[in-house]
Each structure stands twice: as structure tokens, then as C-alpha cells.
Curated annotation (Swiss-Prot):
GO terms for molecular function: nucleic acid binding. Coiled coil: none annotated. It comes from the Bacteria. This is UPF0102 protein NIS_1551. PANTHER family: UPF0102 PROTEIN YRAN. Belongs to the UPF0102 family.
Length: 112
């Protein structure tokens, strides 16, 4: 990943974080790394943990950037996070998708 891509990604995560806070989420952790992969944002609202994947694209629809393989890695990282922190809370996987100046949150992501 080049510097430009890295900076765009970090900017997208900051925008997503501001959006989440504005909408009543509490940010628990950002950029959680494990050997299974990274979780961009871990937030909580109404007793539910939200594991949030942030995708930013200037050209195509960012929803297509969340692949089956990415979801599988994310699920392993979530299991590790929950076990490491001794958590047994309900959770869901969400996406914050950013294309140019449009930000959209999709809750309960699944890939068939």
C-alpha cells in the first residue's frame, strides 16, 4: 500500500469515527490488530458491539470491496478479540462505506 492509499484510508476511518460518535456510538478501539487481521473500528451502542469495516473508494462502489475472504478473516479477528477481552456481548458486523463525499452505514453485513 502506498502512502496516498494509507492516508486516504486513515482519513476515511476518521470520517467514519466522527459519524459513529455523532450517531450515538461509543468507540471502544480502533485498528485492532491480530494475527487474523485488522478490525478498523470497534464501537458499542445499546449494549451491542459493532465491528466496523471502513471502505473508501473514489471510483467504484465500496461495498464490493468487502469480500467473502475479508469477512472470514474479520470473523476470526472478532472471535480472538472477544476471547482476549473475556466478552460475551451480542455483536454485529457493519460497514461504513465512503465514496467521494457520500458516507453510508450498512448494518449486519453478510456475504453469501
Amino acid at each position: 500500500m502506498g502512502l496516498k492509499s494509507y492516508l486516504l484510508g486513515r482519513n476515511g476511518e476518521k470520517r467514519a469515527e466522527a459519524f459513529l460518535i455523532k450517531n450515538g456510538f461509543t468507540i471502544r478501539e480502533k485498528n485492532f490488530h491480530s494475527r487474523f487481521g485488522e478490525i478498523d473500528i470497534i464501537a458499542q451502542k445499546d449494549g451491542i458491539l459493532h465491528f466496523i469495516e471502513v471502505k473508501l473508494s473514489e471510483k467504484s462502489d465500496p461495498v464490493y470491496m468487502i469480500t467473502q475472504k475479508k469477512m472470514e478473516k474479520l470473523l476470526l479477528a472478532i472471535e480472538f478479540y472477544m476471547m482476549k477481552n473475556g466478552l460475551e456481548l451480542p455483536y454485529q458486523i457493519d460497514g461504513v462505506l465512503i465514496k467521494k463525499n457520500t458516507l453510508e452505514m450498512i448494518e449486519n453485513l453478510t456475504i453469501m
